[in-house]
Amino acid sequence: IVDVGPEVSERGRKVISSFVRENQEFDDLEHFIENVRKYDPYRSREHIERTVKYNMIQRVDGKFVSKCDSNPRRAGAQGQMAEKDNVTLEEARSFDFPVLILRGETSNILEPDAATRFRDALPQGQLIEVPNCGHNVHSQNTLGFLDAVVPFLEGLN
């Protein structure tokens, strides 16, 4: 489980929602790239440019927009739907299998104390804090992500 849990930071959610809302369309891709660099300082410019190449399209009016429909995120529907689908700490106590929780060192979504409570609720829970990344562990520190996940997977029967 990567940087989420039964208790997610509302402050962090608002930061992400705000970024999505404020970055809907652009006249110039460079403007979007600079916004992403400010928002996500762990990602290299090359990585952001590659992401932009595959995830943005230019409309007939010349504006650049995401290929993904962001309306549910803009409307806040995603957060409301996710809330009712979240596993509670009480439910986590019944998970009778190994669970690895990864938390980004500077995550604004899964706070350290919430990650610890989640791990403690899991009978076979492990928690690893991956350095040099925030919420997007896999893309902000891919090697750190793999260093955590591979041994866990290799240890499963």
Language-model regions: role of each:
Residues 17-22, 31-43, 54-57, 76-82:
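Helix-loop "lid/cap" segments that line or gate small-molecule binding pockets
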Residues 58-120, 126-129:
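Conserved serine/cysteine hydrolase catalytic core
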Residues 124-157:
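Catalytic active-site module of serine/aspartate enzymes centered on a nucleophile-bearing elbow/loop
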